[in-house]
Every structure is written in C-alpha cells, then in structure tokens.
C-alpha cells in the first residue's frame, strides 16, 4: 500500500499559492530561492497585501498598515491583490479552475495570512498543504514555527521543499 500512496502523490495535480512575498515584509533570499524552485514545477498564484483603510482597518485598529502599492517579488503565473488577511474569492476561484487536487502554500505571515489562506482553501474544498520550510512568521514569531504548529493542528498537511522536489 505505501507504494500506491507514493504513486498517487506523484500523479496529483498541484498548484502553488505564494502569500505576501513582497518588499514590506523583507523576505530573505533563501525564501525567494526556494519559491523559485517550485515556480517551474506547477501553476502558481500569489497574493499581495495592499492597504485600503476603507476595507480593512489596519491603521485604525493595529496602528500599522501595509503599503498602498507593494508588488510581488516572485514570478507567479497570476498575482491577486488583497486588502486583508484572506485571499480573495477570485484567487480561490482561479485555483479551483486549475483543478488542483492539492494546493501547496508558502510565504510570509505564517501565523496570520498564510493560515487564513489555509482556512479559505479548506473551506473551498481544496487540499491546502503547507511547505513548512518556506514560510516566515509575523512579528510575533518571525521563525514561522507558530504558524507551522497552527497549520498542523488545523489542516494536518505539512511538507518540506525537499519532499516536493523529490516527487
């Protein structure tokens, strides 16, 4: 049976969701390089957080706001702008249209925006799977470990970059 599981993973249609890899969050080179290794292997989408106080009260409530015009730092196939923690409905619809059986998720703010993306994908009937060594956390836990623990608790599916590349 283990061989059948391994074989089914190899044949699984996958897509990559890159969350908030943008200048204001200062992604390290290792994160950009790791994501770059996945971009050539599967369809990809990215989210970018931009500020619109009329939609999301970052400044009023948190005393911080993302930039008005930040850009994506990776060459994803499609980039979707969001104004809060969750990915947009259009992004989720696009992933559905790709008919991905599993959505690999990586990026910045593992304990907030990445986790929120996991909830949105899960609720949409997709299979969110975190690439656990391709995340950074928020200012609360820059290591990303808190986000990985929360993801494991809520969704169970965490893989490493090496595991994805080995498939």
Regions found by a protein language model. Give the residues of each.
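Transmembrane alpha-helix/helix-exit interface in multi-pass inner-membrane proteins
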Residues: 51-53
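Short acidic, Gly/Ser-rich segments with clustered Asp/Glu that frequently serve as metal-coordination loops
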Residues: 21-30
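Short beta-strand segments at enzyme active-site cores
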Residues: 45-49
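Active-site-adjacent betaalpha module
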Residues: 2-15, 24, 41-43, 57-167
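Short hydrophobic beta-strand that contains or immediately precedes a catalytic carboxylate
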Residues: 17-19
